[in-house]
């Protein structure tokens, strides 16, 4: 066990045994919708000891993960110490990038699907960043925490309610962070709207609209590698909202979800599934594997969420039809509304005109309401890139919090609640749109948790 001392091994073995026992007794409770017994104390607002240097292990450096190689190589106080990917081509690309930055050589792992466990067994890794196909998110994040690491996992955090509970329980048992890296929460517009909401610009919040509308049929041509090689199959297996968090995450933060309010229940319906089959017929030979799949996922899925405080959120998913990109990013309050794509605002009091017409000139709004974090880091974020800078800013903020002993902006409860839309929408669609309840992953702590602050 290179780099993994006996004491650490024994401690990890004890935690793993406890986790196994907990899972055995909690499984039936999760399956029936009953809130399982807590595995440990809540990790709401978890603060861990300050780290002078954050040692980063990366699992998955393909289409998404290569960006993390660049970001963490540029952030002061972060050092990539280990990288794992089963694809030696993308691993070589990551190694080339590390060398170009003049950084110390990390350890590399690539032999087999479980080579990541060699990375987890190292004592020079503090956090594990997981950017792999969705099916690996849950097991890798869980094993990372059981190995004593903080887990940072790409979206969605997991694919079933039981898996989501398992990550919550493991985080509480190990007292480790498990953050789903919802990068859109760090976009300039989303941060500005959060600042507007916190300053009461829209009055009492009533309704939000979120979406992931992004035409991705072209990914079906990625057969042996890249995202489409594994993501296409989901459209033939599930009918619901496969990818809810990019739009929902920011709206949930506006509404203080898990910090004063909670997602209560959901109802979901889907349109017919036509676009994927038509695209396959047009673009591939009749005997091609893409024409052998039966695509059941509706081209457009629409889910309606009710919160415990009575507010409503519409969440849509469409990666099939030909239309412009949108996440909606709409928030409606008693004093007015903001909507994205394109950005526009209408207010009864405090606006520049009639609330019956949109104000689409955002310059004055940016000048007054740009989030302090963007004011401080926006230029550097844009220069370093990643979806307009949001990716870099997210990574910078993660490292900043760990180095300064601050709680992360997103926790395991956020990742669980936002990701739960996927399995709950599938269940609702399959049940004629009947409502499905969200678990209270916080076990009641949402009622006393402090809202996410405005940090600079």
From Swiss-Prot:
Its cofactor is NAD(+). Gene3D superfamilies: Dihydrodipicolinate Reductase, domain 2, NAD(P)-binding Rossmann-like Domain. Keywords: Glycosidase, Hydrolase, NAD, Signal. Predicted to be exported by the Tat system. The position of the signal peptide cleavage has not been experimentally proven. InterPro entries: Gfo/Idh/MocA-like_OxRdtase_N, Gfo/Idh/MocA_oxidrdct_glycsds, Glyco_hydro_109_C, NAD(P)-bd_dom_sf, TAT_signal, TAT_signal_bac_arc. Coiled coil: none annotated. It is an enzyme of class 3 (hydrolase). Binds 1 NAD(+) per subunit. The NAD(+) cannot dissociate. Residues 1-33 form the signal peptide. NAD(+) binds at residues 63-64, 85, 134-137, 154-155, 183, 243. The keyword NAD applies. Its EC number is 3.2.1.-. Substrate binds at residues 212, 231, 243-246, 325. One of its GO terms (molecular function) is hydrolase activity, acting on glycosyl bonds. Glycosidase. Belongs to the Gfo/Idh/MocA family. Glycosyl hydrolase 109 subfamily. This is Glycosyl hydrolase family 109 protein 2.
